[in-house]
Amino acid sequence: MKCPFCGFADTRVIDSRLGKEGNNIRRRRECSQCERRFTTFERVEDMLPLIIKKDARRQPFDRKKVIGGIQRACEKRPVSIATIEKIVDTLERQLQESGEREIESKIIGQAVMDALHDLDQVAYVRFASVYRQFKDINEFMAELKDILAEGGNVRDN
């Protein structure tokens, strides 16, 4: 591997360890020329399907985009970033295990809504209002009534 400091091509591994999550390998390397040390990480390349957008465009799955959407829905809610990352980890695992080469964006949106529905119903309604693009207040109210019928806790402030 090329040294990031001097560009020399010959480096040696001086230590290898399994990463915290067990899905990568952390390697300490030393350059044979400048003798500086640096860290590299090795992990299996994700084989995620392309996402088919509503307008039929295809684009790679973007973990950051999904996390961002969930974070916006969970803003000022008692949902940790670790919980959000677990939702996206689960989604990525499901996508990998599906073996599909392409998947419609609505399937991803529905999976996120399902996870939020079980986690925080206010975040669920926020996400659904953007994702489903309610056409009017009646559609929005129908969704709220469904949540209330399921025993959801929506408080008046």
Swiss-Prot record:
Binds 1 zinc ion. Pfam families: ATP-cone, Zn_ribbon_NrdR. GO terms for molecular function: ATP binding; DNA binding; zinc ion binding. The keyword Repressor applies. Its cofactor is Zn(2+). InterPro entries: ATP-cone_dom (IPR005144), NrdR-like_N (IPR055173), RNR_NrdR-like (IPR003796). Residues 49-139 form the ATP-cone domain. The keyword GTP-binding does not apply. Coiled coil: none annotated. Keywords: ATP-binding, DNA-binding, Metal-binding, Nucleotide-binding, Repressor, Transcription, Transcription regulation, Zinc, Zinc-finger. PANTHER family: TRANSCRIPTIONAL REPRESSOR NRDR. Belongs to the NrdR family. Negatively regulates transcription of bacterial ribonucleotide reductase nrd genes and operons by binding to NrdR-boxes. This is Transcriptional repressor NrdR. The lineage of its organism: Bacteria, Pseudomonadati, Thermodesulfobacteriota, Desulfuromonadia, Desulfuromonadales.
